[in-house]
Amino acid sequence: MKLLFFFLVLAVSAAVAENAGVQKAFMDIEIDGESAGRIVLELRGDVVPKTVKNFIGLFDKYKGSTFHRVIADFMIQGGDFENHNGTGGHSIYGPRFEDENFTLKHDRGVISMANAGPNTNGSQFFITTVKTEWLDGRHVVFGKITNDSWPTVQAIEALGSSGGRPSKIAKITDIGLL
């Protein structure tokens, strides 16, 4: 009986350790003032804890910010809570912080840090709508969306243009941990 209990504790501990650092977050979205749904994210703090800490630490600033760059069949980009055009934002660590690692890859539906080159992560992020392997090793992936989030992501993607300027305003109205 004691041996069975030991193995049960060991199995539960292993399962908890495997999920340690993975957190779920949400973004409620509106398009031109009308609710467009919710994006649920699985944040991989087990792989990139500093990057996830930065993202979570900016929740209050992300509230009310927009997806300022939207390109169909590529990605939707947000996180510029200062200028709402891709020129602003900063990290919780200062203006910029270094690339943590490139372990996670740019599959369809991942959330990744936007940057201006190596070690220039701030607050801006993007969600891919297709596989974008050419970004591997250049941008830090820190999570992915859940399958039920696709309708909301696709509603934002539908606003896109080849130049990236969205046809309507897609805004984060609320954001937090689940």
UniProtKB/Swiss-Prot annotation:
The keyword Signal applies. GO terms for cellular component: cytoplasm. InterPro entries: Cyclophilin-like_dom_sf (IPR029000), Cyclophilin-type_PPIase (IPR024936), Cyclophilin-type_PPIase_CS (IPR020892), Cyclophilin-type_PPIase_dom (IPR002130). PROSITE patterns: CSA_PPIASE_1, CSA_PPIASE_2. Residues 1-17 form the signal peptide. One of its GO terms (molecular function) is peptidyl-prolyl cis-trans isomerase activity. It holds the Pfam family Pro_isomerase. Keywords: Isomerase, Rotamase, Signal. One of its GO terms (biological process) is protein folding. It catalyses: [protein]-peptidylproline (omega=180) = [protein]-peptidylproline (omega=0). Its EC number is 5.2.1.8. The lineage of its organism: Eukaryota, Sar, Alveolata, Apicomplexa, Conoidasida. Residues 26-177 form the PPIase cyclophilin-type domain. PPIases accelerate the folding of proteins. It catalyzes the cis-trans isomerization of proline imidic peptide bonds in oligopeptides. Up-regulates interferon gamma production by bovine T-cells. Stimulates high levels of IFN-gamma production by peripheral blood mononuclear cells and T-cells. The IFN-gamma-inducing effect is blocked by cyclosporin A (CsA). Belongs to the cyclophilin-type PPIase family. PPIase A subfamily. This is Peptidyl-prolyl cis-trans isomerase.
